[in-house]
Amino acid sequence: MIYLHSGLAQTFSPIYFLVAAGILAMFDNSKTFGFEQETESFLQGLPQYEVVHPYRVDAKGHFLSNFVSHRVSRVQRRETQGEPGNPTRVFYQLQHGGHNLHFNLTLNPHLLAPGFLTERRYGGLEGAKIHSQGPSLCHFIGDVWDLATMKGRAAISTCDGLTGLFKLSQEEFFIRPLERSSDESTAPQVHIIYKRHTSPTQSQLVQPISGDHTTNGTCGVKDPAAALERVERQRERWERRQRRKRRIRQRSISREKWVETLVVADSKMVEYHGTKGVESYVLAVMNIVSGLFLDASIGNPINIVVVRLILLEKEEEDLKITHHADNSLSSFCKWQKRLNVKGEEDAVHHDVAVLLTRKDICTAINKPCETLGLSHVAGMCQPHRSCSISEDTGLPLAFTIAHELGHK
């Protein structure tokens, strides 16, 4: 079922309003997966989306259940790897765009470091609540295909329904639930699928390779809608150059890389997504980032490993986050450097720090504008410059983060 929205002048049938109203009411009451605030305005901002009902199947495609949430305990992970029925593998099917899509997903083994910590701060380290990796894992990567024509990659979190990204026929799609899953219900859980470039941030997040390099050695992602076609041409030229470079690089020995990452969500993020939902949301976004860097098209695999997640329940006195992206980045870079453990062998030492904010940031001025992210170019090996700031725009946030990490 596909719904189109093309502005206030669009006319709709009474049936559309009844169905859409039901979906919006359900979405408004769902409080699911950190999307509490993204209700009617989110769906109205989508020019096109499709309502789908994924279901779980076995490896041969036989129906198992409409309950699609799936978590793997650390004990299960250790004891059953390599065995038939291994819970670290999970399979789904759904109808999308006239195709029967099959998902073959495997637990993302490196998204969370073995010593991963979540830290909730209430204005400083004093009184902070720190806990280690939870008892279960629910972030997966793998393949998606249609038996007739297509095959692509997917990065899906299954903590509460299916949330993530998949790519088919050079197009990228987001999937997310519209309602909370229930152990007691046998009915299918309603989800929506929408293209990356029909999301509310279409003009904002043109491509992860776009951005303006400023004289101070930073790179900012902006959203000049009028320049969309120009940036698309730049992207195509860039991809052609990268393909030529990859052909040369592939002659050398492939080297796997690891990037240990600190992720910080500011108080606006926590307020927006909810204290309970923000952790799952942030890790779902980082799972998409991980999937982007594991794509074979970039050459050598790069593992994005989250070693520490800091959730700021209250603002930090020595961390100033404003609309001014440059000043905010400068403050964050100093703040994260003080937090970092010097010894690389330490479990929570990080190579790069990522700040996620709901502030409407802007390069060079302290007022809202189109900037989505900012980072220092080539700063990975410099602790005071290995940091970035990204504005939360929903699941497309993953592409902003990936863009900024790409400049390291």
Spans of model-derived segments:
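Active-site recognition of the HExxH zinc-binding catalytic motif
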Residues: G142, V354, L395-K408
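Short, well-ordered junction/capping motifs at the entry into regular secondary structure
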Residues: S386-D392
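Domain-wide signal for the mature, well-folded portions of proteins, strongly enriched
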Residues: L112, G123-G127, Q133-P135, T149, ...
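Classical protein tyrosine phosphatase
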Residues: G152-E179, G277-G299, H407-K408
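Fold-level signature of zinc-dependent metallopeptidase catalytic domains
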Residues: I2-F17, A21-P114, E184-C381, D392-P396
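Autoinhibitory propeptides
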Residues: Y92, L111, T118, L125-A225
